[in-house]
Structure formats: C-alpha cells, structure tokens
C-alpha cells in the first residue's frame, strides 16, 4: 500500500508515508505542535505520530526539553511517540523519559505502536547512527516498534549497505520530502532514485500538506 505523509502548515507537520506504485493512499499524520486539534484527523487515518520532546545540546551538555502532547484517552488511531535529537546520543535520562511516556500513553488505553527518532544524521555517518539505533532497539521492549526519519540525501547518496543494515533494527524509515512549508527541491529525481535503489528496510515518504508535488512522481 502506498501511504502519503501530510503536514499541517508551518507549525505542524502531519506525517504520512508512501510505497511506490500503489493505487490508493492511506494517510498517517505527524503532529509537531501540541496546539494542533487532533480532532481534524480523518476517521480512516492510520497512525498518529506525536512529537513528545527533544534532546538539546547547550554549552556542551545535553538536556531533554519536553514539548509534546499529553496522552489522549483511548485514541482510535495507533500512536507513535516522536523524539528529536540534536546530538547522536541516547542518554540514560532520555531513556527513562521514554519509558515514562510509553507507560503514560498505555495507561490512557492508547494503542502504542512504538517510538520514532528524528535526527538528521549526515549521510556519511549512517553506519555510526545505525550503531546508536541498535542500542536504542536493544532497550526498547519487544512489543514496541522503532521508526526513524531520514534525509532524502540518504535515499540518493547513502551507501546501500548502511541503509539495509538497518533492517531488523528499525521497522521503517520515513524520508522527509519537504523543506520548510514546501516540497524538497528536485523531489522527482529523489523519488525516482529511491524507487530503484533496492532498500530492504520498509520506508515511507513524508510529504508536506498542500505541497505542489509532481503527481507523476508519486
């Protein structure tokens, strides 16, 4: 099934994903700002990716800043908790925070799919990033899945062996096909390259809502 990722305007991104060559798009959503009214999500939407906070680097130290959504009660959509990283690190305080968040969402009777890590790893550092993700996966209870966002440069320039090494570590990569409020430049070229690369790890495309994408490229 092809999925499209939508994004809500400037403050909020609604996320979705896509497989090449399918007939109809199912829609998942990213929500990056707690002021978003989740009620606007379609009844037949798929997963709901909720931003919960970020690991910041300040003065050489890392600290976690909570910016996220409080747990809804019995969401009809499976939820994914999203954490943004400014550094390629997964410190113990963040691990404990993630564990608390997962427990809090489940206590509200939500179906928690897992977590997503949003980190713009440089393409040449994909192998090192894969090692960190392996450590995160090892500490994540088996019932939860692990998603990561990815740069479109990964798709076109990353070593295929580094990307495919993520199979069994992550359950999906969501490639970010946008810049700011619009589609990424030369998105058709990126999509064509991605479609023939032979990735073994499941992937999706993150598209900005109302973005002027080339329909033939999707």
Named regions from a protein language model:
Residues 2-218:
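Secreted glycan hydrolases and related glycan-binding modules that recognize and/or cleave
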């Amino acid at each position: 099934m092809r999925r499209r990722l939508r994004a809500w305007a400037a403050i909020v991104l609604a996320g979705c994903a896509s497989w090449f060559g399918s007939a109809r798009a199912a829609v998942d959503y990213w929500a990056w700002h707690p002021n978003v009214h989740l009620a606007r999500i379609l009844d037949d939407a798929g997963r709901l990716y909720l931003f919960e906070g970020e690991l910041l680097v300040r003065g050489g130290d890392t600290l976690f800043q909570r910016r996220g959504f409080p747990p809804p009660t019995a969401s009809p959509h499976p939820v994914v908790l999203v954490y943004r990283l400014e550094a390629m690190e997964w410190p113990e305080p963040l691990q404990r925070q993630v564990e608390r968040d997962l427990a809090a969402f489940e206590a509200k009777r939500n179906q928690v799919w897992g977590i997503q890590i949003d980190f713009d790893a440089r393409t040449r550092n994909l192998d090192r990033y894969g090692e960190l993700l392996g450590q995160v996966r090892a500490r994540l209870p088996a019932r939860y899945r692990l998603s990561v966002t990815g740069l479109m440069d990964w798709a076109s320039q990353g070593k295929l062996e580094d990307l495919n090494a993520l199979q069994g570590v992550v359950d999906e990569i969501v490639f970010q096909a946008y810049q700011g409020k619009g589609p990424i430049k030369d998105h058709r070229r990126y999509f064509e390259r991605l479609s023939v690369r032979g990735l073994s790890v499941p992937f999706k495309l993150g598209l900005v809502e109302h973005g002027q994408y080339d329909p033939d490229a999707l």
